[in-house]
């Protein structure tokens, strides 16, 4: 009857649509259902042998007891022979061995089932993420997306391997044990259930109170994690402004609040657990006393008396753990539901069944009356029209939020237009496959992105089969070869995911070399020189001028000195093009561009 299990799962989250989620989860099992079927068969055999062992031992004890009484009455010498004792002992050992075998088998199969299902869902998530529009990622926190593919799936896997498996074993053991206990003696069984019910009610009442403190503990944990993350990511700025003490004080205060919330939660748990154990002890004493009286009166045999205690222990522990198991499964279902919510997100429009082909893009681009909004009710861009000839340099300028980057996203079909047409060499971009369209572009973004790998691998990201000579040539054209050769391992230098071993300007040079290697028909430079110093900017500008010759190039920049030679300048404001023309013409018109230019060079 005693159980040292912590009775409180303080982090319980319930699924919003439990029945729907369960049915879909069953459908998700697919080819893995046979493993679960075998698990159920193993659980049935495990439960059978677990329940039958005490019953068999009861018969053996009663047989020995009766032979002892007969020997005492007849005055004969009583002796347990090895043949008699060994046979029954061997039978019990076989039962225990069978329990162990079926327990190990069901645990192995359930773990295999959980990991296979985990792998299947993780694959579905990975494929889904590639089919989601950028607008989905814009409105989601990166951590929330990562949580679906990692934490939620791990919680599901853990619940299957522990919570679900233990629940099935517990139900079988409880039903089997209680049935035989009731068969032995209904009154003693009622006494056992009475004390078990009291301990369950006490655990439930305490858990409800604990949840309130647990919620506060979770909030404090989140606050502390955020402060630590801020202190790490902003450590240089904190030191630069001498705010170490203030940052440390905030972290200390959050740590104190977390400790206080945790202490109160743990106090309740540590106070109630001994109380529940006391209740269980009283139950054991009551069963022992009443059972002893019944034994003396001949209403209960010694074998059944000792077997009753075995069944009480077998049933008592899983009964008190049922709440924990159910809470664990509820949390897992909530995690599975969040995974399904991701899998049900609206996807990008599929590529045409028979897409058009551009074997050799030239770079002629036409925007005709383009309209766009993240939702139909909210239009962000309207009536955008302009034409770009092959090999021209187009500059896009405007204040933050004017729509410069959005315009490029529409060109590359990162977002779908709501109206109008975008033509590339006279072909509607929607008639092309996305992969085919994007092969025509090379991008250098404002935020450099380098992955964990060698410098050579990072440069060759867009052309994995590039030779070392091609990689070096691209690096030289981007003015990156010199600094690469100063590194200890040169092109084989391994960069971390944050590439902190090289400067921001050097990271920018590597991304430019990456684009140069791809040799695209159209270039997109989004603030390409915004994170480098003046000298590096001059080197990059010379390299880019060479690269842009004969190529259509879109340049987004706040520093107008980099785009005075553009063939066409688009001035954007609030999602519309308010001016377009070359530098000279726009200055002469005295409009928004002239005002912006004069403000930078006054």
Residues covered by each model-derived region:
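An intracellular "coupling" helix at the cytosolic face of ABC transporter transmembrane type-1 domains
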Residues: 31, 134-135, 151-160, 164, ...
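A short amphipathic helical element positioned immediately N-terminal to and/or at the very start
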Residues: 18-33, 145
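Helix-loop-helix
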Residues: 180-194, 268-337, 342-343
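Transmembrane helices of ABC transporter permease
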Residues: 31, 35-48, 162-216, 287-300, ...
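ABC-type nucleotide-binding domain
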Residues: 78, 351-352, 358-602
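Transmembrane helix-loop-helix hairpins at lipid-water interfaces of multipass membrane proteins
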Residues: 36-102, 182-187, 298-302
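Juxtamembrane helix-loop junctions of ABC transporter transmembrane domains
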Residues: 11-18, 41-42, 49-65, 69, ...
């Amino acid at each position: 009857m005693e159980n040292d299990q912590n009775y409180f799962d303080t982090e319980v989250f319930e699924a919003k649509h439990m029945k729907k989620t369960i049915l879909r989860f069953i459908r998700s099992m697919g080819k893995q259902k046979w493993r679960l079927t075998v698990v159920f068969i193993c659980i049935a055999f495990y439960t059978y042998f677990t329940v039958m062992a005490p019953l068999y031992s009861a018969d053996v004890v009663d047989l020995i007891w009766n032979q002892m009484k007969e020997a005492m009455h007849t005055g004969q010498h009583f002796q347990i022979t090895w043949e008699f004792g060994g046979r029954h002992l061997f039978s019990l050992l076989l039962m225990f061995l069978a329990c162990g075998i079926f327990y190990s088998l069901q645990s192995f199969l359930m773990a295999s089932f959980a990991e296979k299902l985990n792998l299947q869902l993780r694959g579905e998530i990975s494929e889904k993420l590639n089919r989601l529009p950028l607008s989905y990622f814009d409105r989601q926190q990166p951590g929330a997306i990562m949580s679906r593919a990692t934490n939620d799936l791990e919680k599901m896997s853990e619940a299957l391997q522990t919570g679900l498996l233990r629940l099935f074993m517990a139900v079988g053991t409880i039903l089997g044990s209680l049935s035989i206990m009731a068969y032995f003696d209904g009154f003693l069984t009622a006494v056992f259930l009475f004390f078990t019910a009291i301990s369950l009610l006490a655990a439930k009442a305490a858990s409800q109170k604990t949840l309130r403190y647990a919620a506060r503990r979770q909030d404090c944990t989140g606050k502390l994690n955020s402060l630590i993350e801020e202190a790490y990511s902003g450590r240089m700025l904190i030191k630069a402004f001498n705010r170490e003490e203030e940052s440390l004080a905030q972290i200390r205060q959050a740590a104190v609040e977390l400790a206080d919330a945790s202490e109160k939660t743990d106090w309740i748990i540590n106070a109630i657990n001994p109380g529940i154990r006391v209740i269980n002890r009283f139950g054991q004493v009551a069963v022992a006393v009443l059972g002893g009286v019944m034994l003396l009166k001949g209403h209960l045999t010694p074998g059944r008396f000792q077997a009753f205690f075995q069944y009480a222990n077998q049933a008592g522990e899983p009964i008190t753990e049922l709440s924990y198991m159910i809470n664990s499964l509820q949390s897992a279902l909530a995690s599975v539901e969040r995974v399904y919510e991701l899998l049900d997100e609206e996807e990008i429009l599929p590529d045409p069944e028979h897409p058009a082909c551009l074997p050799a893009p030239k770079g002629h681009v036409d925007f005709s009356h383009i309209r766009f909004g993240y939702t139909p009710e909210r239009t962000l861009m309207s009536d955008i029209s302009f034409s770009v000839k092959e090999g021209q340099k187009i500059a896009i300028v405007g204040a933050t939020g004017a729509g410069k980057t959005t315009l490029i996203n529409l060109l590359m079909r990162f977002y779908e237009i709501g109206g109008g047409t975008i033509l590339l060499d006279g072909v509607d971009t929607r008639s092309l496959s996305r992969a085919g369209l994007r092969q025509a572009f090379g991008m250098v973004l404002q935020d450099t992105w380098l992955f964990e790998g060698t410098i050579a691998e990072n440069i060759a990201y867009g052309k994995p089969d590039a030779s070392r000579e091609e990689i070096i040539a691209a690096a030289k054209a981007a003015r990156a070869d010199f600094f690469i050769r100063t590194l200890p391992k040169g092109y084989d230098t391994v960069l971390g995911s944050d590439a902190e071993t090289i400067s921001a300007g050097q990271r920018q040079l590597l991304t430019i070399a990456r684009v140069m290697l791809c040799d695209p028909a159209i270039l997109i430079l989004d603030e390409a020189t915004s994170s480098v110093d003046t000298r590096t900017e001059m080197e990059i500008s010379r390299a880019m001028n060479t690269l842009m010759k004969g190529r259509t190039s879109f340049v987004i920049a706040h520093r107008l000195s980099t785009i005075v030679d553009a063939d066409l300048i688009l001035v954007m404001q609030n999602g519309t093009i308010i001016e377009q023309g070359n530098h000279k013409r726009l200055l002469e018109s005295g409009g928004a561009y002239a005002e912006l230019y004069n403000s930078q060079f006054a």
